[in-house]
Amino acid sequence: MAAVSAKLVKELRDKTGAGMMDCKKALAETSGDTTKAVEWLRQKGIASAEKKSSRAAAEGAIGSYIHTGARVGVLLELNCETDFVARGDLFQGLLRDVSMQVAACPNVEYVSTDDIPQDIIDREKSIEMGRDDLDGKPDQMKVKIVEGRIGKRLKEMSLLDQPFIRDSSMSVADLVKEVAGKIGENVKVRRFTRYTLGEGIEIKQVDFATEVASMTNS
């Protein structure tokens, strides 16, 4: 891949509205040719999706997914701008794929890292700062190590940061962005709930010998 200058990245960003990293990748893939880079971004659905990201997405649909065996279920709200798009195959396919993603990711609790409450972040920092492997390290180094670990942990909790189950070379955020570009509307995952059969129910454990004895005495 060719080296990419900051000036070219800025020019492409101004022209397309795409993110800095997306512009850098597009230019690297096209040997610094801005015209081809624009086409590359459009093919990936990135250029148009970025410009639409600030528009209101008040329509959409709530999808459900029940995993094989009916032990895991998901409800997920996916928003777009028009009811017409919400009924389309591309949108419905995305709704189904993201719902399946939630079912496959038991550790995911939030749509994005921006949704994670500060008290959860503070708790994770406290846990990491107290780990034995940091003993004896300078404070500045501790902070740097913890920041790296926290960043990784927060991404594990974020749906949009997960590798897409059908194509691990892209994230769920990339998938949503790509479909939004193809649809031509702003598309956002608003919220979801994941259900696991029996979750939170305490099962009384009975010793087998005690159970037999109680049956004998009755």
Swiss-Prot record:
SUPFAM superfamilies: Elongation factor Ts (EF-Ts), dimerisation domain (SSF54713), UBA-like (SSF46934). Signal peptide: none annotated. It comes from the Bacteria. Keywords: Cytoplasm, Elongation factor, Protein biosynthesis. InterPro entries: EF-Ts_dimer_sf, Transl_elong_EFTs/EF1B, Transl_elong_EFTs/EF1B_dimer, Transl_elong_Ts_CS, UBA-like_sf. CDD domains: UBA_EF-Ts (cd14275). One of its GO terms (molecular function) is translation elongation factor activity. Residues 82-85 are annotated as: Involved in Mg(2+) ion dislocation from EF-Tu. The keyword Cytoplasm applies. GO terms for cellular component: cytoplasm. The keyword Protein biosynthesis applies. It holds the Pfam family EF_TS. Belongs to the EF-Ts family. This is Elongation factor Ts. It comes from Synechococcus sp. (strain CC9311).
